[in-house]
Every structure is written in C-alpha cells, then in structure tokens.
Amino acid sequence: MDFVTTLRTRPDLFDRLNRAVTLERAAQWFVRIADTYAPSQTARYTRGRVMREILKESGAARDMVFHDNLWQTGSVALELGGQPAKPFWLLAHLDITSYALDVHVGGRYRLFPLCYHMSRSGRHAAVALAFAPGGVGGQVIATGEIVTEEDGAEVFFETSVTSLPKGTRIVYHYPTQIDWNRHMVYGNIDNAFGATALLLAAVAIAPYSPDALFAFPDEEEGQTGAGNQAFCKGSARLFHRCPHDRFPAAVLACDVHESMDMVDGPGARFAVPGQGATYCELSSRGRGGVTPPPLVNFHREFARFLADHGIKLQENRDGYVSRSDSVSAMLFLQNIALIGYLGAHRHFDATPEANLTDLVHLAKTVGVYALVAQDPQWQAQFA
C-alpha cells in the first residue's frame, strides 16, 4: 500500500503526533484514568467523567462529539468526522477487575468475581465502593485486603467494617507509580493503558476530522470460563444496538498482551517491553478474535512504514494474548485488528506493570491507523 499517497493531505501528521503525544502527557492522562476506580457497570460515571474533563482542559472537546452512554450501552465514545457511519472503530474497555460482596462469615466477606480472578494466593490492598443515585462517582466506604486461598478457588475481602451491604463492589487499590529512569509504570494498567492511548490518538488526529469511532466499552471484564458471552457485554451491546447502516468495515481492539508467563500461556519472547506497541494474529489461541491473513500482512507493511517515522509497532509472534472486545466484533465482521501493549500481572497476581514508552508508540500507531482506514483503497481491500 502507498502510505505516502494515502496520507498526502496531512503533511504535518507526524509533527502533530510528536507534539500531541508526549511521555509527559501520556503519564499525566494515564494516572488520572488509572487511579479512578471503575468497577464494571460504573465506567461512564467514573472514568468517563475524567475523560470528559481531560478533553475540555485540552481544548479538544470542540473537535469531536462525546458520548457518555452511546446507544444506551453504558459505553463512553468519541465520535470524529461528519458522517454518521464510521468505517473504522477503535475499542478499549474502560472498566477494571472487580468483585461483588457476599455475606460476612467468619470475620470476613466472601467475594464473587466479576472478572477473571487470576491470583492463586496472597493478599492485596483493596477498597469497598458505594455509588449514590444520580450517576456520581464511587465513594470509598471501607479499606482492607482481597485475600485468595492457596488453591485460588476461594477469594475474600477482609476489613474492620462489618456492616457492608451484599453486592458492594470491591476493587484492588494500586495507586500508579512511575519509574522514570526505566519508564516503567506500576498500577491499574488493564485497560487504562489502552484507553489512554486511544484518548491521546483521538485528540491528536481530531483536527483532520476522520470518520472514526473511539469507543470505551464497560463490562469487558467478566468470568471468561463461562464462554465468550459472559464478558465483553458492553461491546456486545454496541454492535447489537448500532444502526445497521452504520456498521464499520474494520475494528481495532486494544488491550494488554502478556509480557510474562501466566496461567493461560507464555509471555512474549519476540516482542520486548519498551520497544513499542504490539500486534498479533489471534487471541486466546483462536477462541477470541482472529485477524484475517490479508490484514495481518497489512500490519507487517504498516509497521515498516511507521518505523520510518520513528514509531515502533512489534509483531507479537509467540506471546499469549487474552480475549477482549474482539469477541463481540468477530460476530459482526471479519476485519479485526488486535493491537495493544505488553504488560504483566494485569489481574493482580502481582503488581501490574507496563512501559510508558509503549503507550506513546501505541497512541501514535492507532492514530495513524485511523487515518489510513479512511482511504478508499484501504476500504476496498478490507470492507
């Protein structure tokens, strides 16, 4: 594909990306999003409000339409361009791993995971949240620890507060820490990293008015062992409720790719943290989204073009990639791009980590991708 010709009407694109997507801005926006608790079913009231504030402060709100509940799906979305139909969608879920409180027995509360519980044993700092009517953010009503028994089958919340109502949401408490010497980020990376990347990209390319939808679904987290319909509920609603004449030609699903060995598979060996964004061909060994071979070849060609402009996009050839919102998209279209970032311990079997440099490369990658996807030649191949 002739990328130079495709992007010829945007000669200042890469200078614009370098100005809009910096390490400092990426870190600031990530911290604000990641350190906002957003258990499933609350994302638009919590992180959605933070994103709206960021857009207003940056002056970018005038260049896009902000939705805090697109099509009544619970999803936050940024709509760019003037056409009702958006040929290219980008998805990065906004909710975090969370648990629902059960009864208080033996001095602690049993928990029901509303996520894929990956910790096999140990204790992790946690908080209990209450949400008042009217869509306001969560209030911390108790502090304590999420405790997992040795076999990982039982999980509890231990706190000095004994009067919490059943169903109270419990989340891990890991305020962001940044090692600026190594550009390592520790904290709630899944999927604040992906959401921040899409937000940065949308702000950077919005003045070009591409017809693209940047969507941030709620309720991606869920009990994956029950099958594809037990999680990614927010993105499933997006596709079901989207007007039929507005379906995209392609979807990019952005989430964490494993950088270390974990319970479901090996970490990446070929791709390296700190060396850019990553793309892969399939998720969850084919149980999730699968990228068609022609689109995989496009990604290889695209990565070479980006490299000429200092943007790094690595092929993740051997690392395990979990299912994400691609499981919703794959029931409606074939062209699914799995582009994300390397991270470890995403569901708190240890302290989650990722590399801030990769966030910058990821934001630039998806921004350029959204513009390339406007090209009639590209759409003719992948529509």
Model-found features: residue ranges?
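N-terminal hydrophobic/helix-forming segments and targeting peptides
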Residues: 1-383
